[in-house]
Amino acid sequence: ILVRYVDIFYQQIYFFVSKKLFNFNLMETIPYDKRSGKIWFNGELVDWSNAKVHLLNHGLHYASCVFEGERIYDGEIFKLQEHTQRLFHSAKRMGIKMPYSEKEINSASNEIIRVQKIKDGYVRPVVWRGSEMMAISAQKNKIHVGIAAWEWGSYFDPKLKLEGIKLQTSSWRRPPPNSVP
């Protein structure tokens, strides 16, 4: 079912793209590994190019990581507290004890958009287990937290915001929350 859903999702994206609803300027950006600026990394602001993790980190190999995706509008993170609560809830479900408080993560998120001078953009907090050991659980691995932010305008062509956009709703039902841990 998931494969079919993904296939349908991409067909819809292709349909929208073929109708030129998307703003293609988003696709013409600097690769993320070539950008400049700062990233909040384990409590410090580091140069974008120095925010690196080891190839053998547990988060990469065993998916022991969680993240959020947050939009910035007019210099403010949309529903920041709700996103942060969900990040902490996801971490708890993964058995990850957060090394920072919700207040510290909110403060760091606001700090990074201020330092990056972002008016409209995107914030990506990520939490993962480090590379101290490779095992199924690796509960003793250090927990790392990074928060990146970058400019990211609207998904849609600006003139379509004025003209309006036709949307479709799917007959597919979302899986219930208790279907996945």
Label every PLM stretch briefly.
Residues 2, 9-11:
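Short terminal hydrophobic/aromatic SLiMs and anchors at protein ends
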Residues 22-181:
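Conserved alpha/beta cores of soluble small-molecule-handling proteins
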Residues 1-3, 180:
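Cys/His-enriched low-complexity segments
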Residues 4-5, 66:
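Intrinsically disordered, low-complexity regulatory regions of eukaryotic regulatory proteins
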Residues 15-16, 120:
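General helical secondary-structure elements
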